[in-house]
Amino acid sequence: MELAIRTAMRKLGGSLLERLLALDTGHRSQRIDCGSGHLAEFVSYRTKTLDTVLGPITLNRAYYHCSDCASGVVPRDEELGVAHTSLTPGLAAMADRVGAAVPFSKGRDLLAELAGLELSTKRVERCAESDGKAIAAAIDTYAACAGT
């Protein structure tokens, strides 16, 4: 019974999270700074499916395009920490933790068994490796600043 309630609560939580995040689409104005000193123009709203600790959700976000840089800008993705990824920071942290503790395939199994979350072995591996690289870069920066 408790696992059935957990599953129902996770679905309810995912629905609530999706609705809360939908309140802000990321549309700031017709033009925004692209991050490289140019102006990116609003083009349209685009959908993105995110994998969260509450299951998958879909967001509708404002998409801007910078013709000078020939690249897209999605402010809401930056704000939510999901630019260039479909894993939310919460789920990424869980995948990092299991990926650092056990072999990646076992980590995938643990996420499914303990949290009801389905990720591929490769996604657990990529997540753990990405965080490992970020930690190594932070250590290198700290060492350079400390003069060692």
Where are these regions (language model features)?
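Short, positively charged, Gly/Tyr-enriched micro-motifs
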Residues: P56-T148
